[in-house]
């Protein structure tokens, strides 16, 4: 039996202790006991997402896999060798289970009020064993093609991914997370097995538990568990080769009002340890400029040029970062011009002030502490694999951030960044 020792990290703002360790096989484990809840949420995060289609082989050659393969694997891993499915196994224990794939990660979750260790066994089985057959892959291709068509029929999804494709042409971000019709049809037994072997190893995964459980119980579970030897070498990531953006584009769909997206691509790198802080800085900047507390939003809203649909998306990783504003508007051309100009001249924006920053900070504080009442939110937002700050550092980060910090982040993104727009017009 191997002794498992957890390090404690106390977060004073939320009065919580997170227990962390790295097992002998490379798996990172983080625990947050919260006795005031009845449930437990468990989440395994695999550092493998839709952008991870380019890999460097041992001989130095770069191999490209079909777009959508991470999402395809997420679907297939629920299938057991006897053709039963692990989702049903979770249900038989009274647990809910789910999974989702993002640009950089795949997450597998369960929630339950009982049978914690049995659910942990199922979660372990889910991410450490793969059972593929040619027939089951063909069936899954049909299912995912239908899922892809559903997304293509959704105007908001179409707007987001079309804008992203024009921000990052020729990169994995140019294709939807589920893949394209062609790429889905190219996924086969061999490339699924190769990607499972490469990415689904303990050193590339983390487990997070939050809710009503005893740390000692989980500690004992891992001390008694037979851990298989595993490759503990980190998985190399390919950097994107950025091409020129497509500055403006449009299409027609069955929508009642035009939909506009403004995308800003950062062309400078962000260090991995700084990604979470940089994400917060950009959210603060664009909330001041375009959020509901800004004079710009209020004037546009009162004049009927925009409505409450205006939303902000911020993505920051060490390989790419972008900001996207989406909205319904009767005047997409005029608003695109106005927003582009405001972004380029952000240092002169009258909405960017110390007082306004304090208002946005207080709003973010409120949202954060409210979200701490949701185990699901915590389980999906906390990443035990983060090399820098995590969601529990948010209060400390907000207290430390100055207006100068926000402006510096704006310069980092905008000064030599690219801006595109995409419009969906009514057909």
Put a short name on every predicted segment:
Residues 1-85, 193-299, 409, 419-427:
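His/Glu-rich zincin catalytic helix
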Residues 1-2, 85-234, 277, 286, ...:
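Charge-rich, well-structured scaffold segments of protease-associated domains
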